[in-house]
Amino acid sequence: MASPIEVRLQMAYPDFTVRTDLSLPGSGITALFGPSGSGKTTCLRCIAGLEKADQSFIRVHDEVWQDTEKGIFLAPYKRAIGYVFQEASLFAHLSVRDNLEFGMKRIPRQQRRIQLPQASELLGIDHLLQRNPDKLSGGERQRVGIARALLTSPRLMLLDEPLAALDTRRKSEILPYLERLHRELDIPMLYVSHAQDEVARLADHLVLLDAGNVLASGPIHETLARLDLPLAMGSDAGVVIEGTVSAYDQHYQLLTVTLPDSKLSMRVAHAQMQVGTLLRIKVQARDVSLNLQPDYQSSILNRLPVTVIEEALADNSAHVLVKLDAGGTPLLARITRYSSDQLNLHRGQSLWAQIKAVAVLA
């Protein structure tokens, strides 16, 4: 069975060549992640039809957008995409409402799946509709830009580093709106970023690019745990886990989060949440230590029985990265080579992971 989204590109530049062969899910958020110059934006622009690759095949759901072998190239305006750039280019002489309505005009009424009231409510911009763009903050402008893209009733959303031009405060304001779009709209999104914290919070599927090549493509919880990828060697190495809130301790303000497909759970300091709520958390490799026996004489809340899957030298040869299995959930631990030798770590070994900190992402 073919994947809902297929992207095969080859295009040569003086300094590198872009080569992608991707089969992507037709729902959720797929992040294209990598350093500057890795080919993320080029890939997005080719999907949008804004750049032509030397060789290409792009299919979204059941529609072929381009195929160089068959001479197919669908014009950008026919591709049913919503494109969000780093900075929203709004018409300065029009109000927010008029900017949004302008973007809707080319969509026949019978094809409009999203209406202005729904888009403005989803992005929290009802109170901004009468303002002009020069009266908006950077975060407000970008929310208007996202709403404008939604009003084209797209089959695919393309977001090219939409938070890159914003400061930390403005980013934190927009992220919940992107999460809401993810939850409430059945529109796949391709999200370009080089910010690992954004990707960890938003993405379901991760494509890792470097120098125009695809290093990896897969579910984010699996891809972040791969020791053969550069992400595992960085200081922010860690895993993303989507668990379920199973209990709340009102006195200590601790959530109990059950890990997916497992009877194992972790306790997380957080405000009360409804039992059954899905919660995305991140565990950094540097916050995981290993022990042959569970140590209950410490302040560490979370101790999980784990099995060693593999280990690899970290970027600093004094350390190793250890991949662990916690009841089907992957974990990473960054420990010294000395500690590895002292524990006599080996594949299949059973021991205990002690987790010093857990970050709630969403």
Curated annotation (Swiss-Prot):
Membrane association type: Peripheral membrane protein
SMART domains membership: AAA (SM00382)
Keyword Lipid metabolism found: no
Protein EC: 7.3.2.5
SUPFAM superfamilies from the UniProt entry: MOP-like, P-loop containing nucleoside triphosphate hydrolases
Pfam families named among the record's database cross-references: ABC_tran, TOBE
Residue ranges annotated for the Mop domain, each copy included: 297-362
Domain ABC transporter: 2-236
GO molecular function: ABC-type molybdate transporter activity; ATP binding; ATP hydrolysis activity
Enzyme class: translocase
Positions contributing to ATP binding: G34, P35, S36, G37, S38, G39, K40, T41
Catalysed reactions listed for this entry: molybdate(out) + ATP + H2O = molybdate(in) + ADP + phosphate + H(+)
Similarity comment: family membership: Belongs to the ABC transporter superfamily. Molybdate importer (TC 3.A.1.8) family.
Quaternary data: The complex is composed of two ATP-binding proteins (ModC), two transmembrane proteins (ModB) and a solute-binding protein (ModA).
Protein name as annotated: Molybdenum import ATP-binding protein ModC
